[in-house]
Amino acid sequence: MQEELKRLEKEAVEKVEAAGSLKEVNDVRVAYLGKKGPITEVLRGMGKLSAEERPKMGALANEVREKIAAAIAEKNARLEEEEVKRKLKEQTIDVTLPGSPVKTGARHPLTIVIEEIEDLFISMGYSVEEGPEVETDYYNFEALNLPKEHPARDMQDSFYITEDTLMRTQTSPVQTRTMEKHKGKGPVKIICPGKVYRRDNDDATHSHQFMQIEGLCVDRDISMSDLKGTLETVAKKMFGEEREIRLRPSFFPFTEPSVEVDVSCFKCGGKGCSVCKQTGWIEILGAGMVHPNVLEMAGFDSKQYQGFAFGMGVERIAMLKYGIDDIRHFYTNDVRFLSQFKQA
């Protein structure tokens, strides 16, 4: 029996050393140290031994089991260490290699234009205000000098939700709400970017939803010259330092006097081309002095305070600035179109 145990020990240790994987080592462990292994079978025959030989054989069997287990543990440790080294070698990163470029998207052209206009006016002391897109009839019309049954309401068809609420047709309500917060004390210098909604049929130049930026400046002794100077700054910033503007008389219920503002054509320099329709001028926005009724309804004394206001369509400015011929391009999510503004 002693020789058999020694033979099994030698045989098991040799198989452990020859194993090339953790699985093979485990197979050896099960084969020799398991309940059905040969060492267990040898131990079952100890009952045939004398009382004197039995303790010696038991101690020898335990010694053999411990040596085989130690060989298995050592082999497992070596194999695990080799596996770690192999994985580290496979996953080694050369830190001297240049990094992979990150795939970035592009800012939307409307976002670019809005941020450019916001930055300009913030540098001039204006703040940016926002308001609800679902507006009351009062703020969208009445507070802007368009009482019920006023004929000027026909100028823009609206999306009504109830009799007294609608999707705002302009960002002008933000101006009134802001003036009310000031409780009749100036100055008020704000711009109001946001979405507006009108019942237009979508085509190359019209959309039922579009972006608008309106501006308001209310203080003592504000005049048309202040308005003109502000708009000249906007035109030069957006379309180039060589640009000039001209004011044409117009009508808006919430301003008096009211003007349409044209900028000298940035394509032909005012000589006449297809962009300016041979006139040398391009219309960019509407403006005027805030109507006294609007000031009074917002809580300002129109005899002490004056103001000017202006409004521009962001899509129109972007179309002119980037030479885009169809407003629908802004809303189709076409990557080919949007990727052109990656460097903007």
From Swiss-Prot:
Keyword match Phosphoprotein: no
Annotated binding of Mg(2+), by residue: E256
Entry-linked InterPro entries: aa-tRNA-synth_II, aa-tRNA-synth_II/BPL/LPL, Phe-tRNA-synth_IIc_asu, Phe-tRNA_ligase_II_N, Phe_tRNA_ligase_alpha1_bac, Phenylalanyl-tRNA_Synthase, tRNA-bd_arm
S-S pairs: none
EC number(s) stated in the UniProt entry for this protein: 6.1.1.20
This protein's UniProt keywords: Aminoacyl-tRNA synthetase, ATP-binding, Cytoplasm, Ligase, Magnesium, Metal-binding, Nucleotide-binding, Protein biosynthesis
Keyword DNA repair: no
Pfam families: Phe_tRNA-synt_N, tRNA-synt_2d
Cofactor notes: Binds 2 magnesium ions per tetramer.
Subcellular location: Cytoplasm
The protein's assembly and partners: Tetramer of two alpha and two beta subunits.
Protein name: Phenylalanine--tRNA ligase alpha subunit
Source organism of this protein record: Bacillus licheniformis (strain ATCC 14580 / DSM 13 / JCM 2505 / CCUG 7422 / NBRC 12200 / NCIMB 9375 / NCTC 10341 / NRRL NRS-1264 / Gibson 46)
